[in-house]
């Protein structure tokens, strides 16, 4: 009888462990972009919410928005496979930033089809240095002559005088700078997009 009870308890514990492992896998999958392996928009919003709660404790936080220039044109002209390649190359150029090869406390996200975000807590590098690093990584990814052009926008959580901006203003400022850069660079002179 005791052996039967022990067996039942062991089976129950085993089922509970398996359920928890599966639940952890599904949770991780719900926060990851399948195509790129980067965190997705849901994970981005969770990180932003955490930053909002901890903002007073943070020295500063840099938000970079990155967009692939002309992804729709690539898709329409050369097909979805080429567009997917552009997205994957961009993600691979952003990933080293998160993997500690550049700075600590960095998170990278694919937040929409052609849009990415990078959040840097207590940044040591300027936005221009980040942009240069990511573009250099993208050049390494471009071995077949099919170049991808990126546009950048950024915002700091703290103004130069140290006061905090609201989370919505923080995101809006980065988005507005991205749009401004998009207008300035109507045609990307640096890159030929998928010749």
Residue ranges and their predicted role:
Residues 57-59, 102, 160-164:
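Short, solvent-exposed loop/turn segments that connect beta-strands within catalytic domains
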Residues 31, 40-62, 69-96, 109-113, ...:
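Conserved long alpha-helical elements within nucleotide-processing catalytic cores of c-di-GMP signaling
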Residues 187-195:
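Intrinsically disordered, glycine/charged-rich C-terminal tails and inter-domain linkers
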Residues 76, 80, 131, 135, ...:
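Catalytic-core segments of nucleotide cyclases and related cyclic-nucleotide turnover enzymes
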